[in-house]
Every structure is written in C-alpha cells, then in structure tokens.
C-alpha cells in the first residue's frame, strides 16, 4: 500500500469517527447555531456532512465505478446515527435527516465520479 492510499484511509476513518461522535452527542454545535441565528441549519449540515463522507468514501474505494459500497456505508451510518437519537437526551429521530444524509452522500459520489472522469 502506498502512502497516498494510506493517507486516504486515515482521512476517511478519522472523518467517519468524527461524524459518529458529533452526531451522537446530546447537544450539537448546529443546534446552538440555530438557536443563536434563528435559521434552520440542521438539514444543510446533514447534507454537507454526508457529502464529505461520500467524497472520502468514494476516493477511498479502489473500484472506481462501484457505488454500492459507499451508498451502503451511508445507509448504515445514517441509520445508526438516527436510531441512536431515540436514546440520546435532547436528540430526535427525523426521517428527513436520513434523507438528507443519503442525498449528500450520493452527491459526493457524483462529484468524485466527475472528478475521476476529468483525470
């Protein structure tokens, strides 16, 4: 394994752990920002977080046109995070959050697809 491949794996796994950690905390920074600004930022952050997860996962995926791995990963992580919200104080299960997670991940896959196509 070359250093480039190793770094991609480290970035992907670190980011995935960070996402799981942040989404399973009782109070999030996003919620604090929403309260301070009066804006609904939750869905945008779900989309952007999983867009990055999709990009990192697809770049880490050695099979260039294989998308089931990344989509499955997004579904599993999204479901895991949303179902843990049943038991975490001050968190709510929202199906729309899961939808934005998946849309973000698929958008990340599309970005990597076009990036690789140009190279």
Predicted segments, located by residue:
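Structural signal for the C-terminal ends of transmembrane alpha-helices
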Residues: 56-62, 111-116
């Amino acid at each position: 394994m070359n250093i480039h491949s190793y770094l991609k794996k480290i970035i992907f796994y670190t980011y995935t752990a960070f996402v799981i950690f942040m989404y399973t905390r009782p109070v999030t920074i996003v919620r604090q920002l929403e309260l301070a600004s009066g804006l609904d930022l939750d869905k945008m952050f779900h989309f952007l977080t999983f867009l990055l997860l999709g990009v990192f996962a697809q770049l880490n995926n050695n099979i260039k046109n294989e998308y089931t791995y990344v989509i499955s990963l997004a579904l599993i992580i999204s479901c895991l995070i949303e179902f843990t919200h049943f038991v975490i104080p001050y968190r709510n299960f929202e199906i729309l959050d899961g939808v934005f997670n998946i849309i973000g991940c698929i958008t990340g896959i599309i970005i990597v697809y076009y990036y690789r196509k140009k190279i």
